[in-house]
A protein has these predicted regions:
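Short, low-complexity Pro/Thr/Gly
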Residues: 1-392
């Protein structure tokens, strides 16, 4: 019996009936005498809005609030504004080992650069409220109905279930590999583990005209962390986790420079832009990846692991986008997206991958961008994410 899998449904430390925008939810993951199965940690919850009741669902009827949705590529990941991981064990990996801010935008960039919209139709996406279109997202938010004919699905008097989700966040404990097989983490390696999640503001979760006129807030109920543990066999696997660190800055000139020093061993970076004037608009999709005006030159420069100066200069859009796609999978993971697909989806990113890992706490990474932003009507925010590793 001791070797059996245990399926854990963990309540938050700061337990409440519901959580809303800006709330922090904390989970203490304790697995004494057991091993934590990595890459399978999920956040689950029910979604409620002021209009939601047991008989109306989240969006009431088909003809009411039909312009209200999540970003379809991000789905319920958009509820997670930030996620951090903290280990209690004394040693090189004690304290906060990853603190990923602006998480929904990272999720959007990752899925936009690695998956097609058709790939969003599987069951693994549906449970995360990820889907192929805005219209589909609107339907998912209405809540489920069982045993009803298609023509009756949107009748207000028919009982609905509240929409719910189960997402696998792309954070440190879900991004681990081991040469010895499926990665398992023992308490000896890290001690106890605390996962802290801060919820996004309403305008960064939902978008559409209905997000202004009809629904202006949300809450999450029955929030829980789902994971599995196995009996501890007394051995510790060497583990390597993919980790992320991010920074953002305002861009208001035709020539801008980003100089980054971050506590991460990185081998790639990816970035995207968004107009400052639209950042707080619930009507706009704040996770969109628009192209800034008149980008004419992009240059990356840094010293590599041998302290040799490296510089990459890109001038045409195809080269810029191709490098960005490659930067999301620097370890040669599967990538279903082609350059034509990301261009046709009106999604713009910049990025670069390089051959060896560099310590960005000691080496400065620089980015120079020439564009027409300074001559445009609005400033932009540049969101930069650096991808690295952490040995556990």
């Amino acid at each position: 019996m001791s070797n059996s899998i245990r399926y854990i449904s963990l309540e938050p430390v700061n337990l409440k009936t519901t959580y809303s925008e800006y709330d922090t939810i904390e989970f203490d993951v304790i697995f004494s005498g057991r091993k934590l199965r990595l890459n399978n940690i999920r956040l689950a919850a029910d979604i409620a809005t002021p209009n939601a009741t047991p008989t109306t669902g989240d969006l009431r009827t088909k003809n009411t609030i039909n312009d209200f949705q999540l970003d379809p590529m991000v789905g319920a990941h958009s509820f997670i504004d930030s996620i951090s991981t903290e280990f209690s064990n004394a040693g090189k990996n004690s304290g906060t080992v990853e603190s990923l801010q602006e998480y929904p935008r990272y999720a959007k960039m990752y899925y936009a650069g690695t998956q097609t919209m058709d790939g969003q139709m599987g069951s693994a996406c549906a449970c995360e409220l990820r889907c192929p279109s805005m219209k589909c997202s609107n339907v998912l938010l209405r809540g489920g109905q069982a045993g009803k004919a298609a023509a009756q699905v949107y009748i207000p008097s028919n009982p609905h279930e509240l929409a719910n989700f189960s997402v696998r966040p792309r954070f440190l404990l879900n991004s681990v590999s081991s040469a010895q097989g499926e990665p398992m983490l023992s308490e000896r390696q890290v001690g106890s583990c605390r996962i802290s999640i801060r919820l996004s503001r309403f305008s960064n979760v939902f978008n559409g005209a209905g997000a202004i006129a009809d629904i202006t807030s949300y809450s999450l109920a029955n929030v829980r962390l789902l994971y599995q543990t196995y009996a501890d066999d007394g051995t510790d696997m060497p583990l390597v986790a993919r980790t992320k660190a991010n920074i953002k800055q305002n861009v208001n000139g035709n020539a801008i420079t980003l100089n980054a020093r971050l506590p991460i061993m990185a081998n790639s970076m990816t970035a995207s832009f968004f107009p400052v004037e639209d950042m707080n608009s619930a009507q706009k999709n704040t996770l969109a990846l628009p192209e800034p005006p008149a980008v004419s030159r992009l240059e990356f420069s840094f010293n590599d692991s041998t302290n040799s100066y490296i510089s990459y200069e890109l001038r045409d859009k195809n080269s810029i986008l191709q490098r960005a796609i490659q930067s999301l999978n620097p370890m040669d993971e599967t990538n279903a997206v082609s350059l034509d697909m990301i261009k046709s989806g009106d999604m713009y990113m910049i990025g670069l991958g390089w051959e060896s890992f560099i310590d960005l706490s000691r080496q400065k990474f620089s980015l120079l961008l020439n564009s027409g932003i300074g001559s445009s009507a609005t400033d932009y925010t540049l969101y930069s994410y650096f991808h690295g590793i952490l040995e556990m």
